[in-house]
């Protein structure tokens, strides 16, 4: 599973922040593999709106600039929180065709969907999730 959230990185629980930091770069690798196999953006069914579940990762295939910028924010936030992260480099995506390197500005409704999913996860284990190392709900 690869998680890409739309919530501000500064508002993510520590666990969500680390998970996204680890998982987001997988999308760059997946797109590179598809490009190497001759795929173009038009070969994918990309939802016109943000979705969770099936199609969630594919939604971002033509939005790699958004993901690149988000990875910069994730790394900065991890360092700000004092996390010991090993990889602080942001992937150079200039080798990927331009049609995949679009930017994205999430709509408020999309951000709300993303936040609702995070809230749902936190509600399932309220004492486990932390923010700056402190329990969100003690």
From Swiss-Prot:
It catalyses: Cleaves the N-glycosidic bond between the 5'-pyrimidine residue in cyclobutadipyrimidine (in DNA) and the corresponding deoxy-D-ribose residue; 2'-deoxyribonucleotide-(2'-deoxyribose 5'-phosphate)-2'-deoxyribonucleotide-DNA = a 3'-end 2'-deoxyribonucleotide-(2,3-dehydro-2,3-deoxyribose 5'-phosphate)-DNA + a 5'-end 5'-phospho-2'-deoxyribonucleoside-DNA + H(+). The record marks 3, 22, 117, 121 as: Substrate binding. The keyword Lyase applies. Changing residue 121 to Q: 90% decrease in DNA glycosylase activity. The keyword Signal does not apply. One of its GO terms (biological process) is DNA repair. Its EC number is 3.2.2.17, 4.2.99.18. GO terms for molecular function: class I DNA-(apurinic or apyrimidinic site) endonuclease activity; deoxyribodipyrimidine endonucleosidase activity; DNA-(apurinic or apyrimidinic site) endonuclease activity; endonuclease activity; pyrimidine dimer DNA N-glycosylase activity. The active site is at 2 (nucleophile), 23 (proton acceptor). Participates in the repair of UV-damaged DNA by excising pyrimidine dimers that are the major UV-lesions. DNA glycosylase activity hydrolyzes the glycosylic bond of the 5' pyrimidine of the dimer. This leaves apurinic/apyrimidic (AP) sites in the DNA. These AP sites are removed by the AP lyase activity which cleaves the intrapyrimidine phosphodiester bond. Catalysis proceeds via a protonated imine covalent intermediate between the alpha-amino group of the N-terminal threonine residue and the C1' of the deoxyribose sugar of the 5' pyrimidine at the dimer site. This is Endonuclease V. The lineage of its organism: Viruses, Duplodnaviria, Heunggongvirae, Uroviricota, Caudoviricetes.
């Amino acid at each position: 599973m690869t998680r890409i959230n739309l919530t501000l990185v500064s508002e993510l629980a520590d666990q969500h922040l680390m998970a996204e930091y680890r998982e987001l770069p997988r999308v760059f690798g997946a797109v590179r593999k598809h490009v190497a196999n001759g795929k173009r953006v038009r070969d994918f069914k990309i939802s016109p709106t943000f979705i969770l579940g099936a199609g969630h990762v594919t939604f971002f295939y033509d939005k790699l600039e958004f993901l690149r910028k988000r990875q910069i924010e994730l790394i900065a936030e991890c360092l700000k929180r004092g996390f010991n992260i090993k990889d602080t480099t942001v992937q150079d995506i200039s080798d990927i065709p331009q049609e995949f390197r679009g930017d994205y500005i999430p709509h408020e409704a999309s951000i709300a969907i993303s936040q609702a999913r995070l809230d749902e996860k936190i509600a399932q284990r309220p004492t486990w999730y932390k923010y700056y190392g402190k329990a969100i709900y003690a």
